[in-house]
């Protein structure tokens, strides 16, 4: 496709009878996954008051992440055995069943079981959405579909806490999970009616799911989650190290496996665009967790803003990502490499700006700093995903597509653990004075700059290799 054709692709081309119903179905699947964490954050305190289990509260998030990543890692193999439509229905059923388990739970261990099922269902749906966008739509539509996904995450950031908070305020926190279970059933109906049955070469005798490798991956996530749960000067860094080693072992096991590979072959090849692209996503996502976790608390304590105002700043970051993705989604194809370079560079600049402004005295400068980094993400996001998938061979596209949300979530998990270690090792506490909080705020962001620069380097290498491979 030439550049002039790419430039002519607009929203009118994608929001047609042929594509709109498919997009709406995929967006509903993303909504169920994206809103889940926000919903849980506002309903679980009421659940603890009702059924106890405060000591297990942090696991309601971690266990969902474990299930989500495991399911996302598996879908690249599952689509060889079955079509996307059938698999999405199955994962939506798992998600719905998880909602029912949480809604009926009488104690926190049962809630955790339901959360694991929700994670498996949501992670599977998310992985299949990334595969579906490369199978159901022309490649030039991918940036716009990614923009739709970004907007869905934005809506989830707004609505998820409000929905969960409303049910919790009314004293019926369980009803929130019944409502999301019903939404999962609506998704099943939409999938059945609106998504096509693929005429592909399915293999009923395809390779089995590699349980040992998936167990190694699960161990890596659990170790990272433990590191961020309760800080210990010795154990927390050790757990992060062991988590990274377990992740590296998983990658090595998969690379030498004779069958049932989860990852594309090129993921460890730094001379291939897939390897550099995936590392870009992993590292840059890792680097944004400091603000999401500690930004509101620091703004409240250091700048005296209300929790509502701090929440608005965080929402502004989400808005900037989403609107940037929307605005740049119609960019001509020959401009995409530039946007990947500029966007990844803005993430680094935004991180440095956050280190300087969050520890400063101006709230508006903090807002500007958050907008810089998040706009950079939105600017590059759809294009790097599109080009990673394009650079995959035909038999690797499913593995590559399902790897992308997994890389994102692994980055979030490791970033959260590292941010917790930095904050707690510097003594962040309720009793700190403003000067000490400024010191912590500075290092919470500047400490991630080397990793962000490395991610930026991989982004530039990706563009250079992508251009060579495309010619």
Please place each PLM-identified region on the residue numbering.
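Intrinsic disorder in cytosolic terminal tails and internal cytosolic loops
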Residues: 1-18, 460-471
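N-terminal membrane topogenic signal
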Residues: 13-22, 208-210
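12-transmembrane solute porter fold
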Residues: 19-36, 40-42, 52-55, 60-63, ...
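Alpha-helical transmembrane segments
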Residues: 24-28, 92-93, 151, 155, ...
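Glycine/proline-centered helix-kink
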Residues: 41, 127, 148, 153-165, ...
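Hydrophobic alpha-helical interface/terminus motif in multipass membrane transporters
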Residues: 44-47, 132-133, 167, 195, ...
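Helix-loop-helix hairpins in multi-pass membrane proteins, especially solute transporters
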Residues: 75-208
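Hydrophobic transmembrane-helix bundles of small-molecule transporters
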Residues: 169-279, 287
């Amino acid at each position: 496709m030439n550049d002039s054709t790419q430039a002519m692709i607009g929203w009118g081309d994608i929001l047609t009878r042929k594509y709109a119903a498919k997009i709406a179905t995929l967006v509903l699947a993303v909504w169920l996954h994206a809103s889940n964490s926000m919903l849980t954050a506002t309903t679980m305190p009421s659940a603890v008051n009702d059924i106890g289990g405060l000591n297990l509260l942090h696991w309601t998030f971690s266990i969902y992440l474990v299930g989500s990543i495991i399911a996302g890692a598996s879908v690249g193999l599952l689509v060889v055995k079955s079509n996307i439509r059938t698999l999405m229905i199955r994962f939506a059923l798992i998600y719905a069943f998880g909602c029912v388990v949480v809604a009926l739970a009488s104690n926190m261990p049962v809630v955790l079981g339901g959360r694991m099922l929700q994670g498996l269902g949501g992670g599977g749906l998310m992985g299949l959405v990334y595969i579906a966008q490369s199978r159901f739509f022309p490649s030039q539509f991918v940036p716009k579909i990614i923009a739709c996904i970004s907007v869905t995450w934005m809506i989830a950031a707004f609505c998820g806490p409000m929905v969960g908070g409303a049910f919790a305020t009314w004293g019926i926190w369980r009803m929130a999970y019944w409502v999301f279970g019903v939404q999962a059933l609506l998704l099943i109906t939409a999938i059945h009616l609106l998504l096509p049955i693929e005429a592909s070469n399915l293999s009923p005798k395809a390779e089995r799911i590699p349980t040992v490798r998936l167990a190694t991956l699960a161990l890596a996530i659990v170790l990272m989650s433990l590191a961020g749960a309760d800080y210990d000067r010795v154990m927390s860094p050790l757990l992060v190290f062991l988590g990274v080693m377990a992740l590296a072992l998983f990658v090595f096991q998969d690379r030498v496996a004779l069958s049932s590979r989860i990852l594309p072959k090129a993921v460890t090849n730094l001379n291939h665009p897939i390897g550099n692209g995936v590392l870009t996503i992993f590292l840059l996502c890792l680097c944004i967790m400091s603000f999401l976790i500690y930004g509101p608390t620091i703004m409240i304590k250091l700048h005296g803003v209300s929790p509502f105002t701090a929440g608005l700043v965080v929402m502004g970051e989400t808005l900037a990502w989403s609107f940037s993705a929307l605005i740049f989604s119609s960019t001509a194809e020959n401009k995409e490499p530039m946007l990947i370079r500029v966007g990844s560079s803005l993430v680094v600049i935004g991180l440095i700006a956050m280190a300087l402004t969050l520890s400063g005295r101006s709230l508006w400068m903090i807002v500007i700093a958050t907008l810089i980094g998040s706009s950079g993400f939105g600017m590059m996001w759809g294009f790097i995903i599109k080009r990673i998938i394009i650079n995959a061979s035909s038999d690797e596209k499913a593995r590559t597509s399902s790897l992308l949300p997994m890389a994102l979530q692994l980055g979030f998990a490791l970033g959260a653990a590292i941010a917790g270690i930095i904050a707690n090792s510097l003594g962040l506490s309720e009793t700190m004075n403003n000067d000490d909080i400024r010191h912590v705020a500075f290092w919470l962001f500047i400490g991630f700059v080397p990793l962000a620069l490395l991610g930026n380097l991989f982004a530039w290498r990706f563009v250079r290799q992508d251009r060579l491979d495309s010619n």
